[in-house]
Regions:
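M16/MPP (pitrilysin/insulinase) zinc-metallopeptidase core fold and M16-derived inactive scaffolds
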Residues: 60-132, 183, 200-206, 321-354
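M16/insulysin-pitrilysin zinc metalloprotease superfamily fold
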Residues: 90, 131-165, 330, 348-408, ...
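Non-catalytic, conformational "gating/processing" segments within enzyme and secreted inhibitor domains
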Residues: 167, 181, 218-250, 466-467
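Conserved small/polar residues in nucleotide/adenosyl-binding loops
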Residues: 505-510
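Mature N-terminal segment immediately following signal peptide/propeptide cleavage
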Residues: 30-60
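An aromatic/glycine/proline-enriched structural segment found at the starts
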Residues: 232-288, 397, 401-406, 490-504
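Acidic/histidine-enriched alpha-helical segments
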Residues: 99-105, 157-175, 240, 259-273, ...
Length: 510
């Protein structure tokens, strides 16, 4: 492991000196778990195949697509999600008419239940279909599931009659999802993402489009975006990898590579100097809540498979963990200033092209101002004074304990755990070196990263610009909320808050 140690010390040097500088440094590429077969067909289709016998005689089939509602044209709003529904309503090999069973009835005759084992979801930037817990006793069932993936990839029928039938189903889903928080989110997006495609991108889409779109609009979306260079197949279970790979190559051989394909754009999110603040109320909302986001650049996909990435993710995780511990302790007070509070880090709300450190709180009906002030004070305390050695020792020990537990349980990993890892690798280039490598790496990395490095990272995550605020609360007579101007003023006051270093959270665990 000498090469790993050398790379680690370089990474820590950069990390401790300058968090942003790390992003630009070339680092050793991490290996890929040798237990998964990864390949790419000539048409651009990527596949991941792994043998795993937990549970025995079962296998998972997934197809992940690098497409979602963000790619819709204005006249197609909601059709990415509509297409997901149509994938179950007739395909080339499972027509669902007098010539043969559809996917859902065929699967249910084999014990594969719709909703439980057969399902899909559409989000802003991805669409994923799955057939789970498939019995491997019958070879023809396994082969047919592979054929279903093929049809989802390139052979959904999209018959006029079936499209019209599905409009009613989508209308009902649209109405059921039209909750108070959904309405607030829809109204908040243009404020959070001004002049951006993200301003109108929720997958449920437009009811007017759902009711009236011409058939060709959904066929155009399907032809343009469902294509092998944007698709990944994940097959994990009690199967022979060589045999499954050969079958996959044969089944997908007729799927053509696109000619002059449209560019798959990942839309950027603009920076902002002044806070972007949205305040929304709705009669269906029961309790007030407020979220503060501090935006930062997303870690480049091209650099994720490096020690840098693991080091930075570890440090951010430690900072978030320790801040959450402080918030949890405040919540245990006799008369806490909020009913709940938490910190986190990840994609900026619905956009994967920007990251954000976030802190949020919920409160009693008349307590949002106190909750807001408290979480900003704790955020500023973490930025200004950092965390203590005792806090860090506790958080690091818990982290390493979780890593060790995962390592010790590595022979008991279930199929879906591996599938989710491969989906993340395909869609977001998340590394997958395997738990053995991660265990060795983190047991060298974590003990050598000091709390000072964590504190420096927190200073850079909690920014004076790129701030976004979302306040949601009940629409009730007599209930008052802080104004946008008051929230903006409080953010500007953060650095001048009268605070002392944290003394409440330094006692060791019993």
């Amino acid at each position: 492991m000498k090469h790993l140690l050398r790379g680690f010390f370089i990474a820590v040097l950069y990390i401790c000196c300058n968090f942003q500088l790390v992003l630009a440094q070339p680092m050793q590429t991490l290996p890929v778990d040798k237990n998964v077969r990864i390949g790419k067909l000539d048409n651009g289709l990527t596949y991941y195949i792994r043998h795993n016998a937990l549970p025995e005689k079962r296998v998972e089939f997934h197809i992940a697509q690098k497409v979602g509602s963000i790619l819709e044209e204005p006249q197609q709003r909601g059709l990415a999600h509509f297409l997901e529904h149509m994938a179950f309503n007739g395909t080339k090999n499972f027509p669902g008419d007098e010539t043969g069973l559809g996917i859902v009835p065929w699967c249910e005759t084999k014990g594969i239940k719709f909703g439980t084992n057969l399902n899909a979801y559409t989000s802003i930037d991805k669409t994923v279909y799955r057939i789970s817990n498939v019995p491997t006793d019958n070879v023809s069932v396994v082969d047919s599931c592979l054929l279903i993936l093929h049809d989802w990839s390139s052979a959904i029928n999209l018959a006029d009659k079936e499209i019209d039938k599905e409009r009613g189903v989508i209308r009902e889903e649209w109405r059921s999802r039209n909750s108070g928080m959904q309405r607030i989110m829809t109204n908040a997006l243009p404020v959070m993402y001004p002049d951006s495609k993200y301003a109108d991108c929720m997958p449920i889409g437009s009811l007017d489009v759902i009711n009236n779109f011409p058939y060709q609009d959904i066929r155009d979306y399907y032809a343009k975006w469902y294509r092998p260079d944007l698709q990944g197949i994940m097959i994990v279970g009690d199967i022979n990898v060589d045999e499954m790979e050969a079958k996959l190559k044969k089944v997908f051989a007729d799927v053509k590579a696109p000619v002059n394909p449209a560019e798959r754009i990942y839309y950027p999110v603009a920076d902002n100097q002044e806070p972007q603040i949205f305040i929304g109320t709705d009669k269906e909302i029961e309790t007030p809540s407020i979220s503060f986001f501090f935006k930062s650049e997303a870690f480049p996909d091209s650099l994720k498979n490096t020690i840098n990435y693991y080091g930075i993710q570890y440090m951010i995780s430690m900072g978030v963990t320790m801040l959450n511990s402080r918030l949890a302790e405040i919540r245990q007070q006799a008369n806490p200033p909020f009913t709940g509070a938490s910190a986190g880090y990840g994609d900026f709300f619905v956009a994967k092209t920007k990251n954000a450190f976030g802190v949020d709180a919920s409160s009693k009906i008349d307590g949002i101002e106190l909750a807001m002030k408290t979480i900003l004070e704790e955020t500023e305390r973490a930025r200004r004074f950092g965390f203590t050695e005792t806090e860090y020792d506790r958080a690091r020990a818990n982290y390493l304990q979780r890593v060790e537990s995962a390592y010790n349980e590595r022979e008991k990993m279930k199929n879906d755990t591996y599938v989710n890892e491969y989906i993340s690798n395909f869609l977001d280039n998340e590394p997958m070196p395997g738990i053995e490598y991660e265990y060795a790496m983190m047991n060298q990395l974590a003990p050598n990263i000091p709390v000072a490095a964590i504190n420096q990272v927190m200073q850079q995550l909690i920014t004076d610009n790129n701030q976004v605020v979302l306040l949601a609360g009940p629409e009730k007579e007599g209930v008052k909320y802080p104004t946008k101007e008051e929230i903006a003023a409080l953010l500007k006051q953060m650095k001048s808050f009268d605070l002392k270093p944290c003394l409440l959270y330094t006692s060791p665990s019993p």
